[in-house]
Regions:
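Ligand-binding clefts of soluble mixed alpha/beta catalytic domains
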Residues: 1-154
Length: 154
C-alpha cells in the first residue's frame, strides 16, 4: 500500500538517500514475486515511483478514487508554474487555490493516472480485499526469469 508525499529535498538528504534508494529500487526491480500495489493516498515524485509503481515493474497497481498520483504536490507545482502570475495577482490565495484544483484534476487524480497508464484500475475502498485477492490469484504461479548478470549498476 502506498501513501507517500515524497522525500526531503535538501542536498544533505539527497546525498544520504541516493545510494539507499538505488539499492532498494534494484531489489524491487529484481524481485520475482507477484508485485501488487494499492495507492490509498498520495504517491508523489521519486518516492511514489519506487514504491512498487508500474515504472519499476509492478504487475498490478490499483488506486482508491481519492488517490493523488503525480510528480509533485499540486500546490507546489502551481507555485512554480504560475509564480509570476501569482506575484502579480491581488488575490494570490484564491488564484493558488483555483490553479491547484485545476492541476490536481488534470495531473494528479486517479483518473488521469489511469489514462497515463500509471495505474491499472480505480477501485472503491469496500472492494479492496476482493480486488487484491483477484490480483494475487491471477499472478499465482507467476514465472519470471531474471538473467544472470555479470555486473549490476549499483
Amino acid at each position: 500500500m502506498t501513501d507517500v508525499e515524497g522525500m526531503k529535498t535538501s542536498r544533505e538528504e539527497e546525498r544520504k538517500m541516493a545510494r539507499i534508494l538505488a539499492i532498494y529500487t534494484k531489489e524491487m526491480i529484481s524481485s520475482t514475486v507477484p508485485k501488487v500495489n494499492l495507492i490509498v493516498g498520495k504517491a508523489f515524485g521519486t518516492a511514489g515511483v519506487i514504491m512498487n509503481s508500474k515504472s519499476i515493474g509492478a504487475d498490478f497497481v490499483l488506486a482508491w478514487p481519492q488517490a493523488s498520483i503525480g510528480m509533485m504536490d499540486p500546490e507546489q507545482a502551481v507555485r512554480i508554474m504560475y509564480a509570476r502570475e501569482i506575484e502579480e495577482n491581488d488575490d494570490q490565495i484564491a488564484l493558488i487555490n483555483e490553479k491547484t484544483v485545476e492541476y490536481a484534476q488534470m495531473q494528479n487524480s486517479a483518473e488521469s493516472a489511469a489514462k497515463r497508464g500509471a495505474i491499472d484500475d480505480i477501485i472503491i475502498p469496500d472492494a479492496t480485499r476482493k480486488r487484491l485477492i483477484m490480483a494475487y490469484e491471477m499472478l499465482y504461479g507467476k514465472k519470471q526469469r531474471n538473467e544472470d548478470k555479470k555486473h549490476t549498476t549499483i
